[in-house]
Swiss-Prot record:
One of its GO terms (cellular component) is cytosol. Keywords: Cytoplasm, Decarboxylase, Lyase, Porphyrin biosynthesis. Belongs to the uroporphyrinogen decarboxylase family. Its EC number is 4.1.1.37. Pathway: Porphyrin-containing compound metabolism; protoporphyrin-IX biosynthesis; coproporphyrinogen-III from 5-aminolevulinate: step 4/4. InterPro entries: UROD/MetE-like_sf, Uroporphyrinogen_deCO2ase_HemE, Uroporphyrinogen_deCOase. Catalyzes the decarboxylation of four acetate groups of uroporphyrinogen-III to yield coproporphyrinogen-III. This is Uroporphyrinogen decarboxylase.
Length: 347
């Protein structure tokens, strides 16, 4: 009965982002939300987190997550809220000691094989504060606003787990024995499926998979480490929730975006700012999201407005969601974000 009620909720959703993806056509208006729309660019965010001791503490504080998630929707009238969290929650569930160091970013005690990872018996127990936040946000959001849940792509999470932090060379993970890498990715994939299913059950009406490190791979490695696990996640979710909108984001995948769209089964794809929009329009035959350069938005308002108009003109007749090609930079002036949202909503 629970699954039937979830299916009914998803099917009847009036949220504009999920509707654009599911119907595969552009509505009356182009929807807009921004990756990292909740965060350090907002003064209300900085006030809300000033007394917290760590980023992970924020991620597991239900009421704070609700507040932070809703802030950009309230300020800018975004068409979607994305739950305030992090792609490394799955790594934390697997027993890795995830921490965030100012000026360095995420750090993790690195592992070399899947046996070092904890076997999570009940992912819901560890992530319940986040899941409860999803439920509370959904209750507070107007029905026309989407609530986006998310997770990191298994390859990206694996690269952090093995490297221990962000890397420019990815030497540890690329030199790991293929069978060990495969086992780690498989374990991450299974946990990711469980986590995303729970997010949907608690109220998310769209899911995004952030494969932020996809661009380091090519050929067979891209197929095995990005496409294969993504396809497994998509198949598992759509097996339980048919036609559920899933956005993939294989950042910096270049021409491999085409293979990703054709082989994974994702419902829509978010393109990074290096993807030529004319190429995307010609080659990617599913709903598109993107792809303004966040640096333009942060440092050159007039050029950002000009580029936004060009993107809209290119994708106007397609099922399209306006977004950035990566996350909002912390020093982005809020007046620039407001001008961007106003422009998109006026089209």
């Amino acid at each position: 009965m629970k699954e039937e009620s979830e299916l009914a909720r998803i099917k009847s959703s009036k949220a504009v982002v999920s509707k654009t993806i599911k119907e595969g056509k552009q509505g009356r208006k182009i929807p807009i939300w921004l990756m990292r729309q909740a965060g350090r660019s907002l003064p209300e965010y900085r006030r809300a987190v000033k007394d917290t001791s760590s980023f992970m503490e924020i991620c597991y504080n239900t009421d704070l997550v609700v507040e932070l998630t809703l802030q950009p929707v309230a300020r800018f009238s975004m068409d979607a809220a994305i739950i305030f969290s992090d792609i490394l929650i799955v790594a934390d569930v697997l027993g890795c000691d995830v921490d965030f160091i100012r000026g360095v970013g995420p750090t993790i005690k690195p592992v070399k094989n899947f046996k070092e990872l904890r076997n999570p018996q009940k992912i819901e127990t560890k992530t319940l504060p986040i899941l409860n936040a999803i439920r509370k946000v959904r209750d507070k959001l107007p029905e026309e606003k989407s609530l986006i849940g998310f997770a990191g792509g298994p390859w990206t999470v694996a690269s952090y787990i093995i490297e221990g932090r962000s890397s420019k060379t990815f030497s540890k993970v690329l030199n790991l024995h293929p069978s060990s890498l495969e086992q780690i990715i498989e374990q991450i994939t299974e946990v990711t499926i469980s986590y995303l299913v729970k997010q949907i059950e608690f109220g998310a009406d769209v899911i995004q998979l952030f494969d932020s490190n996809a661009g380091v791979l090519s050929g067979e490695l891209f197929e095995e480490c990005v496409i294969k696990p993504t396809k497994k996640i998509v198949s598992a979710i759509k097996g339980k929730f048919p036609d559920f909108p899933i956005i993939g984001f294989p950042k910096s995948a270049g021409s491999l975006y085409k293979d990703y769209c054709e082989k994974t089964g994702v419902s829509a794809v978010s393109i990074d700012y290096n993807v030529p929009i004319e190429w995307a329009k010609e080659n990617l035959k599913i709903p598109l999201q993107g792809n303004l350069n966040p640096s333009l938005l942060a440092y050159n308002k007039m050029e950002a407005i000009k580029e936004t108009k060009r993107i809209i003109d290119c994708f106007r007749d397609l099922p399209f969601i306006f977004n950035l090609g990566h996350g909002v930079l912390p020093n982005t002036p809020i007046e620039n974000i407001a001008a961007l949202v106003d422009l998109v909503k006026s089209q």
